[in-house]
Amino acid sequence: MAATKRKRRGGLEVQAKKPKRSSKDAGQPAKQADVAKEAEEENRDRIPGPVCKGKWKNKERILIFSSRGINFRTRHLMQDLRMLMPHSKADTKMDRKDKLFVINEVCEMKNCNKCIYFEAKKKQDLYMWLSNSPHGPSAKFLVQNIHTLAELKMTGNCLKGSRPLLSFDPAFDDLPHYALLKEFLIQIFSTPRYHPKSQPFVDHVFTFTILDNRIWFRNFQIIEEDAALVEIGPRFVLNLIKIFQGSFGGPTLYENPHYQSPNMHRRVIRSITAAKYRERQQVKDVQKLRKKEPKTILPHDPTADVFVIPAEEKPVEIQWVKPEPKVDLKARKRRIYKRHRKLQQKMSRGSAK
């Protein structure tokens, strides 16, 4: 601001004279403008870091690990869930000999209050435990129809570490055990706000749908232009078995009456195939018995020839001259002539000598 000088008598303000700029000072504003432009260009090319204007209050941490004996598809599904949930932690595989309540101690060591544990049995059946450590409750599911991100190759995509929206079927509010599972899934799959590893964006949605007494999981990308949904993956289906009061055990709060174990399912399939085989064998035995039975000859029915029209008799032509024999050219070629016989005799004599 320009300096002002006040007169003593009149009290009027008179602007002070500005000092003259030298040639050195005249070049400084141009240099400052160039520096400002360079700084703007650098800021344009620079990727801004994550914006965090609040405080991280929700300290939910999820432990995701499995037992030994899982196949490659289960391992890929576990890696996909860890990638989609930035608030998750990993651990080494658990031995089959260890009891399930040992997982509560592992959660305490890892400073986690929720757990997703994949339990493999017979190298073909996969079970998922969702637990609130250490006081419970916990739920056990049978995992079916697994499709991983690498297997699906969908067109959707989302930013790594972004926070998802959770969409639930209205049927979750109808029954009390589904309401409990809804709250359970919200606490596990929702990324806490202002988490250090999360990004302040919402660009995908997790959907939980109830169909055929099962929970179907899908992951969709939210497109900014028209708010359309494009599937990303992975996919899996959770078949509820039991809900326990404690963590990995305790009194049973709910048991699914529609659940059928994989062993029983395989047994039913084997019994169906065995019944089909027995039916085929019985049909073959009946056919053999019918072939051995004597055939019953029915008497001729005179009414069967009522609508039969006799054919017209054609005149018979008698040949008085003997027909000429047909010449077989192939037989003539095969015939051995006199000169051929002589050549064969000479060859046989020469070989004998």
Swiss-Prot record:
Cross-linked sites for Glycyl lysine isopeptide (Lys-Gly) (interchain with G-Cter in SUMO2): K160, K314, K322
Residues modified as N6-acetyllysine: K276
Pfam families cross-referenced by the UniProt entry: Brix (PF04427)
Region (Disordered): 1-50, 334-353
GO biological process: rRNA processing
One cellular-component annotation, GO: chromosome
Nucleus recorded as keyword: yes
Domain Brix: 60-249
Transmembrane in keyword set: no
Compositional bias of kind Basic residues: 334-344
Comp. bias intervals (Basic and acidic residues): 34-47
Main location: nucleus
Gene3D superfamilies linked to this entry: Probable brix-domain ribosomal biogenesis protein (3.40.50.10480)
GO molecular function: rRNA binding
Superkingdom as given in the UniProt entry: Eukaryota
UniProt keywords, alphabetically: Acetylation, Isopeptide bond, Nucleus, Phosphoprotein, Ribosome biogenesis, Ubl conjugation
Annotated InterPro entries: Brix, BRX1
Residues recorded with modification Phosphoserine: S261
Compartments (UniProt record): Nucleus, Nucleolus
Family, per entry: Belongs to the BRX1 family.
Role noted for this protein: Required for biogenesis of the 60S ribosomal subunit.
Stated name of the protein: Ribosome biogenesis protein BRX1 homolog
Source species of the chain: Mus musculus
Species lineage: Eukaryota, Metazoa, Chordata, Craniata, Vertebrata
